[in-house]
């Protein structure tokens, strides 16, 4: 990893170390550092930040860190470590904000149904409060947006399906898929709106930098 920029390298190392710590004491790590809904008994104020360093398994970690290495390294080379880290954490925290906001909307519907005596709604409320969210994926999607806006015509190759497309179309398609799967509640235990939030905050920050003429420094 000698050719990997410092900030990206340190992020990868920290994420890997947290994975090891989670394997050694999973219950403690999840209860303290995963992201819980604000009214959950397990919620702590630092979780919107710390959940970005936790992952649900080796492959979750691997694909996020691989994407960070490929695309984050290029952004850091252009921006420098400080600006890249600002972008990374703003998009990651923005992803957590969007994810929690969508959960809040779900909670309002369930609370109304529970007030009418719905047992299913009560179970949904309990499940939402007890279910943790982990992963750097929100920030990673922000990184993809940043790359696509800096290099819109760069060709990105998908592993599955094995096709190549320009970065601007890649990000647009991924965003549409995340929105569709989020709205239809398909795709398993994946925080689709967190991914979408990373894209949104990445776009907003890139537009702000573009208007302030600080996009490349």
What is the meaning of each model-derived region?
Residues 1-217:
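A detector for small-residue-rich transmembrane helices and their helix-helix packing motifs
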